[in-house]
Amino acid sequence: MEKKIDFKPDSYLIRSGNNFLGILNDIKRRPEDAANELGVSIEEINSIISGKQKISPSLIEKAVNIWPVNERDFYIVSDDCSSGILIMTSQDSIKSSRIMERAGKPYYEYRDTAMSKTAPFRPEWILELCKVENNDPENPKAQWNNGHFMHQFTYFIGEVNFYYKDPEGKKHVAIMNTGDSMYITPFTPHTFTTRDGASQNGLILALTYGSKLTGDIQQELSSLSLDCGSQYALDFTNHENASLSLLEYYFELSNLTKEKFAKRTNFSMETLADFFTKKKLPTFDELKIIAKALNVNSRDLMPNDLTESKVIVKTHDQCDHWKYPESGNYEFYELASTTALPHSKAFEIDVSSSEDLNLDLKVGLHQYVYNIGDSALTINWNYENKTYQKSLNPGDSAYIKPFVPHNFRGNGKILILRIGGKISGDSQRELSFVGRENTQRAISETMQWFDPKGSNS
């Protein structure tokens, strides 16, 4: 038997214990069952569940060898943002500086900016060290990457050329200046240079982030064969193909025959044939009938409203802007975004001095903040009934957890990128269906799925 190691209960161990209890509930094991099957004492199992003891790697190894679980199921996300907001100073960013060479010459200087273990941001400050004399997309000085798995929003500072390839492999160049922005989908090959004659090297804030496909989803896909996993990618190249792909996918899940489908919908076989050959797209009312017949929601059968480019470029003068809130503490400039990621929002925000103490900002998204101005700002916030105040100096960056009330005060300019992470969208809908009254157990399980003493209530 392994020697018991006692730990002072902390938030990580408590959450880890709740996670372990959730695993036992899912596979219908009582603590005594787990102790018996894992060959340890019931005291050790209860100590892990109560957050008094860390689960050991050797115990996890035993568990994955006898139960249908994976090692990663036992490890929880570390919360390095216990106050709700994490700040990285410009001095700390400078300490992370590293020069990346391409084709044997210095090409980029990279610096880290604010990142948290609780959020999918991977934002970088990148200085373009390569200068070009023209705007030719075929310029041999431009050294291309292979694209990457992360979505990327980029904010431009200075005179920067942004090179990218379209889906057909054709090279393009966009002439970018301060305040311009862009979004690219994963695996889009691209690169950046400084235009010759610029007073200083161009700079980008390359805010890369994972959305729904990273983490557990990617792991689930990787456990399938390439052929099977690839079939999850439907044809969304245009509205018609997307509509048909969704209809076919949910129809195949139902195992209905066309004849049975016709009876359920009261559509003729000819009408169904038109739907399945794209001769006709279902109207909204027809989609509701189809959804009812397939026992799904109408939204499940609806393609995106727009089929947008994989590269979206937006100059600063194209940005819509407005004052917020009514008091006008901020002026928002709406930067590049895509409707394919409805929970990703990017803004340049002018902050106006205010003595108003109201925490006038709160959104249910992960937020990245960078002070792109020349003056210091103050950020105030409240988290778990505690009030905080910190300075955000030029070049400082921050991460803000979802639903944290906060404000910015002073006179300056900030960049904000908001993303949904894993919870927004279908996960949020599922949690809402489970009900707010059950969120505590859904977030972190605290009780066994049944009472051994019995219950008649």
From Swiss-Prot:
GO terms for biological process: organic phosphonate biosynthetic process; regulation of DNA-templated transcription. GO terms for molecular function: DNA binding; DNA-binding transcription factor activity; ferrous iron binding; oxidoreductase activity, acting on single donors with incorporation of molecular oxygen, incorporation of two atoms of oxygen. This is Methylphosphonate synthase. Residues 32-50, 258-277 bind DNA. The lineage of its organism: Archaea, Nitrososphaerota, Nitrososphaeria, Nitrosopumilales, Nitrosopumilaceae. The gene is mpnS. Disulfide bonds: none annotated. Catalyzes the conversion of 2-hydroxyethylphosphonate into methylphosphonate in the methylphosphonate biosynthesis pathway. Pathway: Phosphorus metabolism; phosphonate biosynthesis. The existence of the methylphosphonate biosynthesis pathway in marine microbes may explain the supersaturation of the aerobic ocean with methane. Methane is probably released following degradation of methylphosphonate produced by MpnS.
